[in-house]
Every structure is written in C-alpha cells, then in structure tokens.
Design a protein with these regions (language model features):
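Hydrophobic ligand-binding cavity/cleft-lining segments
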Residues: 1-51
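Short hydrophobic/aromatic-rich motifs at helix boundaries and adjacent loops
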Residues: 2-3, 46-47, 72-74, 120-124
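Beta-strand/loop substructures that line and gate deep hydrophobic ligand-binding cavities in soluble
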Residues: 89-147
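Short, surface-exposed coil-to-beta transition loops
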Residues: 7-9, 70-74, 96-100
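Glycine-rich portal/gate segments that line the openings of hydrophobic small-molecule binding cavities
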Residues: 33, 44-93, 109-112, 147-158
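Amphipathic alpha-helical segments that line or abut small-molecule/effector binding pockets
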Residues: 19-22, 146, 150
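Residue-level detector of flexible, active-site-proximal loop/helix-junction positions
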Residues: 38, 84, 120
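Generic structural detector for well-ordered beta-strands
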Residues: 11-15, 76, 103, 118
C-alpha cells in the first residue's frame, strides 16, 4: 500500500479491559456520543436485507455535522481482529479516501487505545478547494481523535 498523503494517531490509557474497550470501538452507532464531528449513523443492509454488524466488508453510513453543514459518509470495514484491531475506510474500498483505525493493547492497568487517521486519496471536495481544505480536514481529524478517545475512555471507565 502506498504511503498516506498525511496521517495522525494518538493513544490513551483506559482503566478497563480490552473487551470493554472493544465493545465501544465496534459500536459505531454510538460514535456520536464521543466525536466532535460524527453525530451517529446506521449500518447499511446487505444483499439479503440484513444490516451490517461490523464484519469486514460491512458498510456503515456515518452522519456528520460541522457548524450548519451536515453530510453522510459511507465507510467500509476493512480490518477486524477481536479485542485488537478495528479499521474502516471512508468512501469504501472503491474510493479509498481516509483510513480510520483503532488498535487495542492490554496492559497492567487496562488497555492502551490508539486511534489512527490516514488520508490516502483526495475527495472531490478536497481537490476542488485545494490545500486549504486538506489542511482543514487534517486539523478536524486531530480534534475529533482527541475527543473520541477521551469520550471512549470516560464511557469505558464509568
């Protein structure tokens, strides 16, 4: 895989088991409780009409808001290792825009949770608005990662 255009990751120590943290990381419908941008979302139904559950290949529609702007973003689950790794890509594997990844590492006091963001390809909006949009999205991702990690920590430790 090629190097990302830009990337960022942060970690947080959580005083909870990997299983507890995993239950939050994989509950994408709850991301709106923690994210500074995402307000929730829903699993898309497969060809049999059954909503996804977070398996590799399942698709989730995230609902996002920034100021007055609201939009939906399709993501596809690309990696899932129970209590270890959960990753998805914005735009699905076809567009391969932004990779989001959560890695869980058990330790003596609980779990280290790392969230990573990697811009792989530019969206039409990023191309249209140029570097200013790219830098804005990167700053927004950093803010969202911090908020999400802190929110998940609070939820896991409560």
């Amino acid at each position: 895989m090629s190097e990302p255009i830009m990337s960022h990751s942060e970690s947080i120590e959580i005083n909870a088991s990997a299983e507890t943290v995993w239950s939050l990381v994989t509950d994408m419908e709850r991301y709106g409780e923690w994210s500074s941008e995402n307000t929730g979302g829903y699993w898309r139904k497969n060809e049999e009409g059954i909503p996804g559950t977070g398996a590799v290949g399942d698709e989730f529609v995230g609902i996002n808001r920034r100021g007055e702007d609201e939009w939906k973003a399709l993501v596809e689950i690309i990696d899932r290792k129970e209590n270890q790794t959960f990753a998805f890509v914005t735009g699905g594997t076809a567009m391969n825009l932004i990779h989001w990844r959560y890695d869980l590492e058990p330790n003596d006091s609980g779990t280290t949770l790392t969230e990573s963001w990697a811009l792989r390809n530019l969206s039409p909006l990023m191309i249209e608005n140029g570097d200013e949009e790219v830098q804005f999205r990167a700053a927004n991702a950093r803010e969202s990662i911090t908020a999400t990690l802190q929110g998940m920590k609070a939820a896991a430790e409560s």
